[in-house]
Each structure stands twice: as C-alpha cells, then as structure tokens.
Regions:
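Short, structured beta-strand segments at or near domain termini in extracellular proteins/domains
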Residues: 162-173
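Functional-site microenvironments in short loops/helix caps that host divalent-cation chemistry
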Residues: 6-150, 157-162
Length: 173
C-alpha cells in the first residue's frame, strides 16, 4: 500500500504469527481489503449482502435466531489491550441461515464504501469482541443484524485496527 503505517501490524516479515492461520486478517484499511479482494477475483460485500447473509429472509435479530446467546460469539474483551481474535469457525452454533460463520462478535467487517457529497465513510458490520470501557472514540457494539457502525475514513493508517477485518464475496454466475 502507498501508506503502510500499521499495515498488517501483527505480522512479521510478511507472515502472520504462529497459530494465527485461522484468524481473521486485521490491520487493513478499506483500500487494503479491496485490493486483496480484487487480487483474489472477489470483492467486498455490499451492506445489503452482508445483511442478507446474516439475517436470511425471515428478519431474525441475530444470525442464529431472535434470542441473544453469548455462547455463540467470542467472549468480550473489556481490557485496555486487545487479545487476539478468535479463530474463524470457532463458534459454529453462531452460523447464519446460510451457514456463514463469524458474522458477529469477532471483528468488525468492512463493507463497500458509503459516500455522499459531504462525507466519505464506510459501513462496518458484525461488531467486535473488543469492548473497551470508558473509551470516548470507540463506537458501541452492534451484535444485532439490524445494527452497524459507520466509520469516517480519514487515511488508511488511521482506518487500520486490530478490531477490524473483512470478508470477500464472489458474484454468482
């Protein structure tokens, strides 16, 4: 990337840490995630696609149904420093009606960019296990399928976070 500050911050010499092969990739900006998706022949999901994957067609509040169940998501981290995210597929009982895993509670997920004539922002979905106490900048959790965060995009180095990753989609043919 043009601005590599904090890019893949947990990685060393181009490699993820030992034992991290199944964890979400974090410390990537929206541009980084888009570049990877394009390289892989995919793209980032539109917000409505993420919503459909999480909610299905029956309007459920959470990917698994309408009743909150903390055992279906990673345990919250309320400390000052973040632990590593959970492995992908670590919570299979939290799958959506389409069997999509880890839609909520592991890391926030980039969706395609939101832009109007005044603002450049991105819609973030899924919420994160990281829930710092007393933080004035970190937006509240969004576990429900009908909740999201909106992040004002400043510069790639500011947009990268250990609590923010992405997933890719591919158009059906």
């Amino acid at each position: 990337p043009k601005d590599d500050q904090n890019f893949l911050k947990d990685w060393k010499n181009g490699n993820y840490p030992e034992g991290w092969g199944n964890k979400p990739v974090t410390w990537v900006s929206l541009e980084d995630a888009r570049a990877y998706a394009k390289w892989a022949g995919k793209r980032l999901p539109h917000d409505w696609e993420w919503q459909l994957a999480a909610q299905g067609t029956d309007g459920r509040e959470y990917p698994w149904g309408n009743t909150w169940d903390a055992s279906r998501v990673p345990k919250p981290d309320k400390g000052r420093t973040m632990r590593a995210p959970d492995d992908g597929n670590a919570h299979p009982n939290g799958a959506s009606p389409y069997e999509v895993m880890d839609l909520i509670g592991n890391v926030w997920q980039w969706t395609d960019e939101f832009q109007d004539e005044h603002t450049r922002a991105a819609i973030l979905r899924g919420g994160s296990y990281y829930q710092p106490q007393g933080s004035v900048w970190y937006f509240p959790q969004a576990y429900r399928d009908d909740e999201h965060g909106k992040l004002l995009l400043m510069a790639p180095s500011y947009d990268r976070s250990a609590a923010l990753g992405f997933r890719c989609v591919k158009d059906a043919k």
